[in-house]
Amino acid sequence: MLHPRARTMLLLSLPAVAIGIASSLILIMVMKIASVLQNLLWQRLPGTLGIAQDSPLWIIGVLTLTGIAVGLVIRFSQGHAGPDPACEPLIGAPIPPSALPGLIVALILGLAGGVSLGPEHPIITVNIALAVAIGARLLPRVNRMEWTILASAGTIGALFGTPVAAALIFSQTLNGSNEVPLWDRLFAPLMAAAAGALTTGLFFHPHFSLPIAHYGQMEMTDILSGAIVAAIAIAAGMVAVWCLPRLHAMMHQMKNPVFVLGIGGFILGILGVIGGPVSLFKGLDEMQQMVANQAFSTSDYFLLAVIKLAALVVAAASGFRGGRIFPAVFVGVALGLMLHEHVPAVPAAITVSCAILGIVLVVTRDGWLSLFMAAVVVPNTTLLPLLCIVMLPAWLLLAGKPMMMVNRQKQQPPHDNV
């Protein structure tokens, strides 16, 4: 016979698995549609018209039209494509299901059009809304927070292809007690995350790791080097934190999201022309291209880091529907490669992983997620102790500092003004 605690944990197991599978399938569907549209916009259409896909006019034109299209969706769709991600944490409150079609369309347009944002925030928002709406009908005795946690965990597992990230994130938010141990509370979310990760793995494998030279043995000087790299990444990230609410306020004075996002898309197009095609899109595939290109110099990496960070701020401030984690990882990789080129004595594994740790920590203010991203992009067990040590001064630097988010009470997203 199972203990009552075990029966309690098993109660949500089937819903957790179902939510994890559904979360992954929704992610896969959105990414597949976006990939087809991206191929049409950036490969087939310019080829048919006899235009180079890296033509400045094409880059500016596609991103400007993408901004206008997303603005029209936000302006006229029911629910105005959900909340402005610049004003929301990664895991937020459920939104009405009526806003989901507009949110999904806005996300697909942004991903396909080359906007420097990832899918994580909108996909989590969509899956939370569906889980809460359906779960409340099927199992009304289960509270909304449980459905929110399961949907978030399932989506995070699907996004990263592993339940580890969900375990790390929720281990600090689901506090245990004398009556309910932490792992009892983690059981159902981990089931959802595992189901999401395994489902994603049936269709494709998220590829985060970079072909960076293996790091052998940790030295004391490496800790100092890593801390300096993380501090540089944090400094760069805090510039973006300072810029985001100010640019957001300035752009949303126009009130109409079509104008705001059209101008935002035009600015992104100019940044894309300066940085080149590798500086477009969410950044995961592009960082692989950046590492593979042996022709890049220190100044090239610096330019890519600056352009991508600027594009991230502009896209978020404009109100594009997307997440900030994936492009932040690209910025960290570019910064790390730049610092390694500048000081070759410091291994690239240290500069890249510590730069990712620093910049993701600024964007998410989540220590576990920052460690996870650094560890999966530069997969080397020798680095783990160093990253844990470097996290300490990095966390001290950010203690009490503002987050990369717009204060909703001061700044209203564009759909609130229509």
Swiss-Prot record:
One Gene Ontology MF term: chloride transmembrane transporter activity
- What is any Pfam family matched here? Voltage_CLC
Q: Which UniProt keywords apply?
A: Cell membrane, Ion channel, Ion transport, Membrane, Transmembrane, Transmembrane helix, Transport
GO-annotated cellular components: plasma membrane
Residues passing through the membrane, by range? 9-31, 55-77, 90-112, 122-140, 147-169, 189-211, 223-244, 259-281, 301-323, 343-363, 376-398
Membrane topology field: Multi-pass membrane protein
Q: What is the predominant subcellular site recorded for this chain?
A: membrane
Protein family (similarity comment): Belongs to the chloride channel (TC 2.A.49) family.
The protein's name: Putative ion-transport protein YfeO
Species annotation: Escherichia coli O6:H1 (strain CFT073 / ATCC 700928 / UPEC)
